[in-house]
Amino acid sequence: MKITILAVGTKMPRWVDEAYTDYAKRFGRDITLELKEIKPEKRGGGVTAEKGIAAEHERLIAAIPPRARLVVMDERGKNWTSVKLAEGLKEWMAGGGDVVFVIGGADGLSAELKQRADVLLQLSAMTLPHGMVRVMLAEQIYRAYSILNNHPYHRE
């Protein structure tokens, strides 16, 4: 199974890339975690937040593989525990196909993309820095994977 994190934004600090890579390489052969960065729309010069979100929406849609399960990260999404994420991961693995997690840009995501999501999920009700979200999401996906594999990484 392939899990992709689509994240609007490029040029993260080195610590973000290093932390993400640390979690991404921990998976076994049955799961691959991949990060795809989506170029953010430049703001200013007549480009409103709405126009920026629309342009980023088109880039995100183009990057989502057909038939992939879509999980959109949003601070108003469902508040799952790590165990609930593991249950979701187990269900997605059994159903076959790939999973795409989407992290929006500075101005958020389009309503259309949120409506298209199979799951609207939050890491926190608070707004978080995008680099931190990449790392936290990769960690939680790995934690869910470790729960399913009875690995001692996760403790209740």
From Swiss-Prot:
InterPro entries: Alpha/beta_knot_MTases, RlmH-like, tRNA_m1G_MTases_N
Species of the source: Chromobacterium violaceum (strain ATCC 12472 / DSM 30191 / JCM 1249 / CCUG 213 / NBRC 12614 / NCIMB 9131 / NCTC 9757 / MK)
Lineage: Bacteria, Pseudomonadati, Pseudomonadota, Betaproteobacteria, Neisseriales
Pfam families per record: SPOUT_MTase
Binding sites annotated in the UniProt record for S-adenosyl-L-methionine: G104, L123, S124, A125, M126, T127, L128
Record's catalysed reaction(s): pseudouridine(1915) in 23S rRNA + S-adenosyl-L-methionine = N(3)-methylpseudouridine(1915) in 23S rRNA + S-adenosyl-L-homocysteine + H(+)
Keywords annotated in UniProt: Cytoplasm, Methyltransferase, rRNA processing, S-adenosyl-L-methionine, Transferase
Xref: CDD domains: RlmH-like
EC number(s) on file: 2.1.1.177
Gene3D superfamilies named among the record's database cross-references: 3.40.1280.10
Enzyme's top EC category: transferase
Function: Specifically methylates the pseudouridine at position 1915 (m3Psi1915) in 23S rRNA.
Matches recorded under NCBIfam families: PRK00103.1-4, tRNA_RlmH_YbeA
Molecular function GO terms recorded: rRNA (pseudouridine-N3-)-methyltransferase activity
The keyword Transferase belongs to this UniProt entry's keyword annotation: yes
Gene encoding the protein: rlmH
Name this protein carries in UniProt: Ribosomal RNA large subunit methyltransferase H
UniProt similarity note: Belongs to the RNA methyltransferase RlmH family.
GO cellular component, one term: cytoplasm
Subcellular location: Cytoplasm
Subunit structure: Homodimer.
Keyword Nucleus: no
